[in-house]
Amino acid sequence: MKKIVLAFDSFKGSVGSFEIAKAAEKAIQEELPDCQIIRFPIADGGEGTTEALCSALHAQTVSCRVHDPFMKPIEVSYGIVNNGAMAIIEMASACGLPLIDSSRRNPMKTTTYGVGEMVADALKRGCREFIIGIGVSATNDAGIGMLKALGARFLDSGNGELEPVGENLIKVHQIDISQLNPALKESHFTIACDVSNPFFGKEGAAYVYAPQKGANSLQVIELDNGLRHYAQVIKEYTNMDISQLPGAGAAGGMGGGLLPFLNAELQSGIEVILKTLRFEEVVRQADLILTGEGKLDRQTGMGKALDGILRAGEKCQVPVIALGGAVEATEALNRMGFTAVLPIQPFPVTLEEAMRPEFTKENIERTVRQVVRIIKQFTK
């Protein structure tokens, strides 16, 4: 075996994709010292997106002060590439779930305002091309916070300006974009997301994702009604129907909420990364692709990061083996095309222990070593 590509997503809440790949690389080097190993950390639009792209493109990292989901000041960073022309922004850095303790999470009250501030900062620096990775958000405001930070105003039936939070979507009566940052007319946005959910409904932003952001059952209904109402207001103002657009429900409606007001397109996060970094060229002469994420299940094949890796492997006729902290629906994953799907846990453990970073890295290293030892026996 001469060439192995390591294309791991993060094991969310435990270890990032870079550290996972390093652990796998160590095991391969010990078993196959002459093998070429290419680390290709990936992400699907959520956490790790900026890191993966910026590292591969040798981006300049810049920092700025913005507001978190509860409008508290924080410092964030993002990447600039292409001689200052493109900004790579991770939504989660300004309004991600990890920024809020689980006891304080409430998508009725959170906002994407800080993401808009990041965009405004990049516009001031001269950027006109944007990749925004959306996902792992603590918000359900359909992007009105981001748009407000860029100059938009959202008014109620009495012409009062609304605070851009999830609970106020139902109250939006008018949208005023007359003061939108003029540099946006010269800009293009690629919105990279990791899901295909519609804007509202039983499979939409509120019902599927708001509970993990802290919403109770009544709040889920309120948020969904707000998204329905806001979609209708958008249609009246822009003649664009985002109601059933695949991916519109990503990141609390951020996926669909930006398209009517920006020169933007919504793309699968993993496709953005694989295309930008020319993944197919990397794997074309490989003997094996090793990939993985924290949980492998039926959703793995629904536009998520590993699905993109698998499709690239199939196109280049390279086998793909996936490792997971937890594995469900093994047979279904095999039918999707994975050569093998393996759990990394050596024995039953608590969730807390399974998520411990050092334990995860040890398990990745041990499992990869066993995979390589098996392959060695059949490739002598």
Language-model regions, residue ranges each:
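N-terminal loops that bind phosphate or other acidic moieties
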Residues: 2-134, 138-380
